[in-house]
Amino acid sequence: MEIHGFNKTTLLDYPEHIAATVFTGGCNFRCPFCHNGELVLDPAGQPSVSEEEVLSYLKKRQGILQGVCVTGGEPTLQRDLRKFLQKIKELEYPIKLDTNGYMPGVLWELLQEHLIDYVAMDIKASRDNYARAAGLPHMDISRIEESIGILKSSGIPYEFRTTVVKGIHTVGEFKEIGRWSCILLAELSGE
């Protein structure tokens, strides 16, 4: 597992949990406002943290820490993510996953295997402005919509969040995000 950061204690990253946060490298988006740009653009240039170091710390903190947040970059791009999450689960920690939602198949598999307990998914912009906000010339927006549907029917707690950026987001943009969300959620509910 490619780990490029480890915050040993956080009160912010996993709602209602004292948690540790693991940062993965790499991302399939190029958001111009990314707050972890170095993990996205140059993961190999960032210090590495071994999986063993993380797991050893988590084992020592059992009974003190209440969960683990896995973030990035984009964790769902990591080929060893599933195995890593299984090892955390063996330590009996609940896991929160932060994701951009562009890998719905991975999200589905992790949910089916009960490897994640909470998901925070970014909604970058309205449907029409998504590619620009994600820093991609072209993208398949249906993958975002599929992930929203997967989370809605997952039975686990989740949140959708938007990083507000001047020049990308306006009041009108947020109204469009709201309209799109309502339409999509109504379609998913069969209404």
Task: Tell me what each language-model feature is.
Residues 23, 71-72, 161:
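A secondary-structure boundary/capping signal
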Residues 37-68:
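Conserved alpha-helical substructure of the radical SAM core
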Residues 1-17:
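Short, charged low-complexity linear segments at domain edges
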